[in-house]
Structures are given as C-alpha cells and as structure tokens.
Amino acid sequence: MLSSLLAVFIGGGMGSVLRWAISMKMNPLNAHIPLGTLAVNLLGGFIIGLAIAIFSRLTHLDPTWKLLITTGFCGGLTTFSTFSLEVVYLLQDGRFMWALANMLLNLAGSLVMTLLAFMLVVWINGQ
C-alpha cells in the first residue's frame, strides 16, 4: 500500500511540474488557444495509451509502475488522459453512443461547472 501511495505521489508531482513548465513556455505563444494546455492534454492521452498498451503486454511488470505512470504522472499532467482512455475503452467495446455521451457530459459538464464557479465568485465579490 505504501509503495502504491508513493508511486502516485511521485508520478503526480512529476506530471504536475511538467504541466506547469510546458504551460509557462507554450501558453504565451498564442493569444487564442492555450497551446500548453492543449499540448499536455494531447501528450497525456498519448502517454496513457502507450502505457496501457505496454502494461497489457508486459504483465510481469510490477503494478506499481503502472500506478506511477498512469494515475500519478498522467493524472498530474492532465486528467484528460484518463477521460481519453475511458472513451477508448467504450469505443473498443462497441458502445459508441455511451462513448459519445461520455464525451459530451465530460466536456459540457466541465465547462458548465467552471462557468458556475466563476459566476459564484463574481456574485460573492459583488455582495
């Protein structure tokens, strides 16, 4: 249990620092699209797909490595990678409508919650 916690902790720290560094370098490059955020989301999706493919074939590897890379590193880099993997699993299972629903709910839900949180802060500050 302790090794699992440490793996997630270390991987998460590494992913978070990388996300920050990439965002600091790339976001100022374009005023319309946060390129750093896009880059880490795409990178995270690629890494988690690569990791799952590798770990499914190399079953002798210690599961702690999977935790470090997927839950820790990719989770720290972006939660978008986990979402992407879940959609891929739904598509692989032939559950296309559920994959679409999952995509729409995650994207729209996240945007709505972000907007609601922003509006709440504006409302509280206006009181």
Curated annotation (Swiss-Prot):
GO annotation terms (biological process): cellular detoxification of fluoride
Signal peptide range in chain numbering: none
Gene Ontology terms: cellular component: plasma membrane
Domain of life of the organism encoding this protein: Bacteria
Residues spanning the membrane: 2-22, 35-55, 68-88, 104-124
Subcellular localization: Cell inner membrane
Activation/inhibition comment: Na(+) is not transported, but it plays an essential structural role and its presence is essential for fluoride channel function.
Binding-site residues for Na(+), renumbered to this chain: G75, T78
InterPro entries assigned: FluC
Pfam families: CRCB (PF02537)
Main location: membrane
Record flagged with keyword Cell inner membrane: yes
Family the UniProt entry places it in: Belongs to the fluoride channel Fluc/FEX (TC 1.A.43) family.
PANTHER family: FLUORIDE EXPORT PROTEIN 1-RELATED
Function: Fluoride-specific ion channel. Important for reducing fluoride concentration in the cell, thus reducing its toxicity.
The name this protein goes by in its record: Fluoride-specific ion channel FluC
Gene: fluC
